[in-house]
């Protein structure tokens, strides 16, 4: 399943980059995130809890940054499993940040997600709707947190 989009924010590119890559940012912006810990400079482990269809799923995952071109490009690979054996997932995400007019940045993202097990039985339509909803919440949270950070 491929999910992609882009949005703009009024923020300096370097501060946006630093903010996006801070583990504390991710845990505060991802809906349902219960934990996010840095394993090393390029790897995070986390737990996210989400309601999908009729069930609530808790996911353990590891995210590793595989390409870094500060402050414009990052590629990350993720691997996770649902607590209780409801399935596994893999994910590859690319985020590109570029400066545009008026002190704004454009953040473009593309993510390929593969689901196996009970997670996959919900079907792409249900999963895509859920992922899009979470993505929208993440973007709003990110914009709010970055505005708050810039105001300090």
Feature names for model-found ranges:
Residues 80-129:
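Beta-strand/loop substructures that line and gate deep hydrophobic ligand-binding cavities in soluble
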Residues 16, 20, 26, 65, ...:
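Hydrophobic pocket/interface hotspot
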Residues 5, 34, 60-67, 78, ...:
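Hydrophobic/aromatic beta-strand elements that line small-molecule binding cavities or substrate pockets
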